[in-house]
Structures are given as structure tokens and as C-alpha cells.
A protein has these predicted regions:
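Intrinsically disordered, low-structural-confidence terminal and linker regions
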Residues: 21-44
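Extended polysaccharide-engagement surfaces of secreted carbohydrate-active enzymes
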Residues: 221-314
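Catalytic cores of extracellular degradative/oxidative enzymes
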Residues: 33, 56, 63, 167, ...
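Short secondary-structure capping/junction motifs at helix and strand boundaries
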Residues: 2, 18, 110-111, 165, ...
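Aromatic-lined, polymer-binding surfaces characteristic
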Residues: 40-217
Length: 314
């Protein structure tokens, strides 16, 4: 038993040292800047220090173009290759690519040679399990966040390329219709019943896709519902965070996310509420919201940092 306790203590100390060594961003326990200043600070921080590979690599490129820096070829090609590999969770990356494409419509930020690759990737993507093409690797479609990731990506892709024929034979208009029916149900269920993955690390994912819908969905009802559900999610985090940590129950969580000095949503709480740290790889929501029209209601921001009043949440 002593041996087990000793090993456990050493593991925790090692983990804490790793966290401290990695940290390039100050952990805030109280807000020190306005929401707009935090957005600017985060984009600059992540453009310089953010991860350029794996599932969230394309979001580093969003941060770069948002502050006026050029996109980089190699990380973008890696992101395209990852999506085309048909691996699980490539729906994270495709949503980042779509935000880039919509940003490019407002102001040219994607070089022509990279845009060609990204567009081909979007037109070829498998947007739902009923697409007749067989998956070559396991892909999760059914969990709460993945459902909406796929439907959001399909809606935004269909809107962009209404008259184009996708690899699966459907045109953009058909993809919009296919996604819209499923998205409306998902949004209605979240507002009526809340999240089955309540207070989980996946709020970071869901805040990102909701921001994409809020900014770019052409259907006014979907935009409005996305904003309402995003307010609901922010209120949930405001009630249950403590100085940027979600020390609550959750509908889904991995051990490595619990045994840590910060939480997957800590960059999001720092951006929205001014408490937490930007020093994590889970930044899809902060990137999306730093480049979004969405504004978190002031009353929710005030609730988020009111730690003086005891609260029982059932």
C-alpha cells in the first residue's frame, strides 16, 4: 500500500511539474481585461504558441489570419491529409476549415493554392453515416457533440457550394436540407432538455460549432437557436466553474482531464469570463468565439465570477 501511495504522489508531482514547465500563459483567478482585449490577447498568444498539427492544427491558422499573419502551407496540408485519412474526430478539423472559408468570403485570407486543397477536402467529406461510402476506420457519429459537428459542417458546406456536386453525388442544396432537419432537432433538444454530455470537456467543442452556426447559418431560425443554446451553455459554465475550473459532475470525462492543473474549458472560461488559462491545446471554441460576432451576456459574465454566494446545483 505504501508503495502505491508513493508512486501516486510521484506521478502527481511529475504531472504538476509538467504543467508548470509547459505554462507560457498566466493563470487568471480574477478578470484583468475586457472581453475584446482578451480576444485580441488570445489570438496573438495562440498564433505564436498554438499547436500546428493533429486535430486542432487548422485552428492555429485561423488565429494567424485573424491577426493579419499569412497562412502556412505545411500545417494546412497536414490538416487536409488528416481529414482525408477518414480518422475519427476529423469533424473537428473540417469545422475549422469551414470557418476559414467563410472568413475568406469576407476578406481574402486563404492563398489560392491552399484554398483549392481545402475546397476539394470539403466537397469530398463524408458528412453522415448514411453516406454510401464505407468508413475505412472507426468514426464516432452518435455522441451529442459529434452529431452536431457533422450536421453543422454539412450545413455550412452546402451553403457555400449550393450548385456543386459533392463526391457522394448530392449537391449543396441537398446537403443543406439533409443537415437542417437534423440540426433543428438537435438545437431544440439542447434548449428543452440540456446536454447529455453535461458540464463536460466537450462544451469546448459544442461552443465552437454553435459559434459557427451563429455566425454563418443562412437560416435565421437556426442562427437564433444557436445563439440561445450558446447562451445556455455559457450560463451552465458560469454557474459551475470555480476560478476557471469545472469542478463539477459531468456527463462525460476522461481521467487525464480530471488529474490536471487546468480543464479543457479553461481557455474558454478565460476568454469569456476572465478566469482560467490559455495554455492548453483545446482551443476550438476560443478560436471560433474570438473571431465571432457572438457576445456573452454581461449578466452571465458577472455570475461566472461571483464565488461568494453558496449554490447547490441539482
Amino acid at each position: 500500500m505504501k508503495h502505491i501511495i508513493t508512486v501516486s504522489i510521484l506521478f502527481i508531482l511529475s504531472l504538476l511539474q509538467t504543467i508548470q514547465a509547459k505554462g507560457k500563459d498566466e493563470y487568471w483567478y480574477t478578470p484583468k481585461a475586457s472581453p475584446e482585449e482578451r480576444k485580441e490577447s488570445f489570438l496573438k498568444y495562440y498564433a505564436e504558441h498554438g499547436r500546428k498539427d493533429f486535430l486542432t492544427g487548422i485552428f492555429n491558422q485561423i488565429a494567424r489570419v485573424a491577426i493579419g499573419q499569412p497562412m502556412e502551407d505545411e500545417p494546412t496540408y497536414k490538416a487536409v491529409a488528416l481529414v482525408r485519412s477518414n480518422r475519427d474526430c476529423n469533424d473537428f478539423s473540417i469545422n475549422g476549415m469551414l470557418r476559414l472559408l467563410y472568413m475568406d468570403r469576407e476578406k481574402t485570407v486563404i492563398p489560392a493554392h491552399l484554398k483549392k486543397e481545402i475546397e476539394a477536402c470539403v466537397l469530398d467529406f463524408k458528412y453522415w453515416w448514411d453516406d454510401g461510402r464505407r468508413d475505412t476506420t472507426y468514426r464516432c457519429y452518435h455522441t451529442e457533440n459529434h452529431q452536431a459537428l457533422y450536421h453543422t459542417a454539412e450545413l455550412l458546406a452546402g451553403q457555400l457550394y449550393k450548385d456543386r456536386i459533392f463526391t457522394n453525388g448530392m449537391n449543396g442544396v441537398q446537403h443543406v436540407q439533409h443537415a437542417k432537419e437534423r440540426l433543428e432537432r438537435w438545437l431544440d433538444f439542447r434548449f428543452r432538455f440540456g446536454f447529455s454530455e453535461w458540464l463536460s470537456t466537450y462544451y469546448e467543442v459544442e461552443a465552437m460549432l454553435l459559434a459557427n452556426l451563429y455566425d454563418y447559418a443562412e437560416d435565421e431560425a437556426i442562427r437564433k437557436k444557436a445563439g440561445m443554446v450558446l447562451d445556455l451553455l455559457m450560463f451552465d459554465m458560469a454557474l459551475n466553474n470555480f476560478e476557471g475550473m469545472m469542478g463539477s459532475t459531468s456527463g462525460r470525462m476522461y481521467a487525464h482531464s480530471l488529474i490536471n492543473g487546468s480543464h479543457n474549458t479553461s481557455p474558454l472560461t478565460k476568454l469569456m469570463f476572465g478566469v482560467g488559462t490559455f495554455d492548453r491545446d483545446e482551443v476550438m471554441a476560443p478560436i471560433a468565439l474570438s473571431t465571432s460576432k457572438y457576445q456573452c451576456p454581461k449578466v452571465i459574465q458577472e455570475i461566472a465570477i461571483d464565488y461568494q454566494r453558496p449554490m447547490l446545483n441539482r
